Regions:
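Basic, glycine/lysine-rich polyanion-binding surfaces/domains
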Residues: 1-236
């Protein structure tokens, strides 16, 4: 059986008193219903600080996050904890697993084409995830999403925001952009690289750019799930 561990991911366990209520008031997606969901923790201005998948484990929540960002995410969440009886810590006994087509686990909540994920003790490192993710046009992590407005990260198209759940950090600007249908720039994956790339991945021949929707690069990968959004007229 092929190895499936995504070694660049970490798991944060949030446990204690009213964990779902605590996380619900902070992140962009609704964590009170069926999980997993993809969510962001934003600045008050609606810019992305961290993105992660939220899983349930009994009364606890597990955050499937970028490994290099895990400690900073814990610190950021702890700011909001105040006097709540809540613990936020790495769970080193659990790893994130991925398969393109094994059928094991749960479908990635962002896009079924991404494959399936599950949480379990680590095995060998998975191969092919980076290129597969980029080829279907999905961006993640601070290098790709960091400090961009959440809707510019294609969050609405990838099920990464709820406009009915109520307040979250950065909700006001995010909701305003959605109401005005004003998303002038988008994150896109392009073939090759260039001076305007946010991140380049020469090992797979792909890069991530932050482009105006009225000036999409000719070498951009435009997946079906994003075409309708890019067809909307931009505003100055």
């Amino acid at each position: 059986m092929a190895a499936t561990t995504l070694t660049d991911r970490a798991v944060i366990r949030v446990s204690g008193e009213d964990v779902r209520g605590f996380v619900q008031g902070l992140v962009t997606s609704d964590v009170m219903g069926e999980l997993p969901v993809w969510a962001g923790l934003l600045t008050p201005q609606g810019k992305c600080l961290f993105d992660f998948l939220v899983w349930s484990d009994g009364d606890d929540l597990l955050l499937d996050c970028e490994g290099d960002a895990a400690d900073e995410l814990i610190k950021r969440l702890s700011i909001y904890r105040l006097r709540r009886q809540i613990r936020i810590e790495r769970d080193v006994e659990i790893a994130v697993h991925w398969s393109k087509d094994s059928g094991q686990g749960s479908a990635d909540p962002r896009l079924p084409e991404l494959g399936t994920r599950w949480l379990a003790p680590a095995d060998g490192p998975a191969t092919g995830w980076l290129e597969h993710r980029l080829r279907v046009g999905v961006c993640e992590g601070r290098a790709e999403l960091g400090e961009l407005l959440w809707l510019e990260c294609n969050a609405a198209e990838l099920n990464g925001v709820s406009f009915t759940k109520g307040c979250f950090v950065g909700q006001e600007n995010t909701a305003r952009m959605n109401w005005r249908q004003k998303v002038n720039r988008r994150l896109l994956v392009v073939i090759g690289g260039g001076e305007r790339s946010r991140v380049e991945y020469p090992e797979v021949g792909l890069s991530v750019v932050h482009a105006r929707v009225d000036a999409i690069p000719a070498n951009a990968i435009v997946p079906d799930w994003l075409k309708d959004a890019l067809a909307q007229p931009s505003t100055a």
